[in-house]
């Protein structure tokens, strides 16, 4: 029979059978980790709709990543999603061996027309990060903000820069302490790093990694979340969070596959606020506690971002302390 398998990639024509696309996720960290959790949640939602049939592997080492890709491709998966920041070259080499399999991978690099089945994405949620920075700039009393990140790679750097820019628009005298822990998932190390920043005068923390909000809670200061909303776990600590919605990214890829139009592309734009890829989490327990001037500016900038009259600068360079 004519299967969805042979007609998903560009040039093969549309598929008419609405069969779920056999999809595999490959993650180097647990699916509970905040960044990967957004991909996982979107994939589960797509499976619930009947668009995909989803399986996944977590805690896959970078050295093992290519082998797992090959296993899923050999098993008949036609869409493979994940993050290849630590296995960029190896992942592309394997993808080239399976031209009838579509790859949608988190990557620090752009798409390559020579590898038409390999699309890339990243969490370009700088818009939400900017808005959360405005709130942080209004809430700090010491004018000293601590920022703990995983690695200084573009997808982290741009969010930190956007947060800093938002804070500085609200309060141009703010100083920042910036540090990277060299891990995507090491809550104890993130917590230890945050404690040092608090000792050095920070009274609000940018929690790019798990563990930072724990330090803020223990020392009774505030934190700003990233990618997911953890206020339910830290109701008196996390003021606001820039949320990443992976659904627009994945749904676009699924639609392209269903139409037989999937090709190498940069899906990062579907993380922009105007595409529905990011938002500021509800203030919840901090509703009414953020200065009105800050909230007025947040609403103005949000409207400006959505209309295109204000653009948050994307700066992928490593940020430093001030």
Locate the predicted segments by residue.
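N-terminal export leaders
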Residues: 1-2
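Flexible loop/hinge segments that line or gate small-molecule binding clefts
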Residues: 96-122, 227-236
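Extracytoplasmic "Venus flytrap"
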Residues: 21-49, 55-65, 85, 152-158
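Short beta-strand elements at the ligand-binding edges of bilobed clamshell
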Residues: 112-135, 147-152, 235-248
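Periplasmic-binding protein-like
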Residues: 77-84, 104-106, 200-210, 226
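Short beta-strand elements in bilobed, periplasmic/extracellular small-molecule ligand-binding domains
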Residues: 49-59, 171-184
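An alpha-beta-alpha
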Residues: 43, 129-173, 178, 266-288
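Hinge/cleft segment of the Venus flytrap/periplasmic-binding protein
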Residues: 259-322
